[in-house]
Curated annotation (Swiss-Prot):
UniProt GO cellular component terms: cytosol
Localization per record: Cytoplasm
Keywords associated with the record: ATP-binding, Carbohydrate metabolism, Cytoplasm, Galactose metabolism, Kinase, Magnesium, Metal-binding, Nucleotide-binding, Transferase
Active site: 174 (proton acceptor)
Protein name per Swiss-Prot or TrEMBL: Galactokinase
EC number: 2.7.1.6
Functional pathway: Carbohydrate metabolism; galactose metabolism
PANTHER family: GALACTOKINASE-RELATED, MEVALONATE KINASE/GALACTOKINASE
Family note: Belongs to the GHMP kinase family. GalK subfamily.
Annotated site (Transition state stabilizer): 27
GO MF term set: ATP binding; galactokinase activity; magnesium ion binding
Length: 388
């Protein structure tokens, strides 16, 4: 969607001109899964599937929201003085949360807004539509109210909204990737220290194909919180002998020597995934920097196997996509991405083989699962921004 279309749609809905237009990307994580809430390393990119916005300031204290993705809900009106979570306010709880925490941080938002939203991230796909919306709202508020914010502070407010307003116990990776994204770069982030490096992403003759299971993944209702609790329990058991706060601090030799402290076989498997995935993510960064895409692909495959057997967050749909992808010509690697339990997988595919790949994987998936997957090419882009 371009800026003139955004402005046109805004005027159709609100009857006045927008002040500015905005874009906030989605994200995929190339490798480093379920490590972000375990103090580990991640390697995400911001992508051109994302959330568009148009907005204007109002003279009163009313917030009016409209989403083209939820047209049937019409314009949702919220008083600026009442930024509490209310179930009937549906998707607008995300912007309300961001505004609430911006105010709590001492920023003055002294009048209402009209905000038009259009997103082309498929709902429930696990490509971070909620984080994309959170960062979009932050950028809108920065621009309309002339607020000077460090981007990292905005990223943290997005996470705070997710955790403390919506009630989802997620890590910081999604908001970080979306807020800090850079053209043609992956972000190597240490979630323990929030130190990060931009890693140039030269895929040569290959593209990242996103494969959507089209099985919705409701993060708050999934086993995500259960996995997180298992990891936290494993840490507390290891603390009997080890001075650690997170699994991300462990190398595999140390973990292997002390894993006997963990009293449950499942918790050992969960912790083993995190420790090894952390090492794979560092190796993947080195492979990218060395231009070793074959090595990078092998690490993607190993990541999926670990998520399937040790972390147990894949399921029939994601496994069918990844396993079928591994068998195709021109594929360097494939894995699930995101929280799992549905959502998306990704594959690194030679660009001349993409059509054959989509046909073969799509056909096999439909045979096994009973309905078709969707495919998108992931184009890497910069972080949340003002368009005009």
């Amino acid at each position: 969607m371009n800026t003139s279309q955004l402005r046109e749609k805004f005027k159709e809905v609100f009857g006045v001109e927008a002040d500015h237009t905005f874009f906030s990307p989605g994200r995929i994580n190339l490798i480093g899964e379920h490590t972000d809430y375990n103090g580990g390393n991640v390697l995400p990119v911001a992508i051109t599937l994302g959330t568009y916005g148009a907005a204007r300031k109002r003279d009163d204290k009313v917030l009016r929201f409209f989403s083209a993705n939820f047209e049937e809900k019409g314009i949702i009106e919220v008083p600026l003085e009442n930024l509490r979570f209310e179930k009937e306010h549906n998707w607008t709880n995300y912007p309300k949360g961001v505004l609430h925490f911006l105010q709590e941080a001492g920023h003055t938002i002294d009048s209402g807004m009209d905000i038009y939203i259009y997103g082309n991230i498929p709902n429930g796909s696990g490509l971070s539509s909620s984080s994309s919306l959170e960062l979009l709202i932050g950028v809108i508020v920065e621009k309309l109210y002339d607020i000077k914010l460090e981007r990292l502070d905005l990223v943290k407010i997005g996470k705070q909204t997710e955790n403390d307003f919506i009630g989802v116990n997620s890590g910081i990776m999604d908001q970080f990737a979306i807020g800090m994204g850079a053209d043609q770069c992956a972000i190597y982030l240490d979630t323990n220290t929030l130190k990060y490096d931009l890693v140039p992403l030269d895929l040569k003759d290959n593209v990242v194909v996103i494969m959507n299971t089209n099985k919705r993944r409701e993060l708050a209702d999934s086993k995500y919180n259960e996995r997180r609790a298992e990891c936290e329990t494993a840490v507390s058991e290891l603390q009997e002998k080890l001075d650690i706060q997170t699994l991300g601090e462990l190398d595999f030799l140390t973990f292997d020597a002390y894993s006997y402290l963990i009293k449950d076989e499942n918790r050992i498997k969960r912790a083993r995934h995190v420790v090894l995935e952390n090492q794979r993510t560092l190796q993947a960064r080195k492979a990218l920097e060395a231009g070793d895409l074959e090595g990078f692909g092998r690490l993607m495959n190993a990541s999926h196997v670990s998520l399937e057997y040790d972390y147990e967050v894949t399921g029939l749909e994601l496994d069918t996509l990844a396993h079928t992808a591994w068998e195709q010509e021109g594929v360097l690697g494939a894995r699930m991405t995101g929280a799992g339990f549905g959502g998306c997988a990704i594959a690194l595919v030679n660009k001349d083989k993409v059509e054959d790949f989509k046909k073969a994987v799509g056909q096999r998936y439909e045979e096994v699962v009973g309905y078709a997957p969707s495919f998108y090419i992931a184009e890497v882009t910069g972080g949340s921004r003002v368009l005009d």
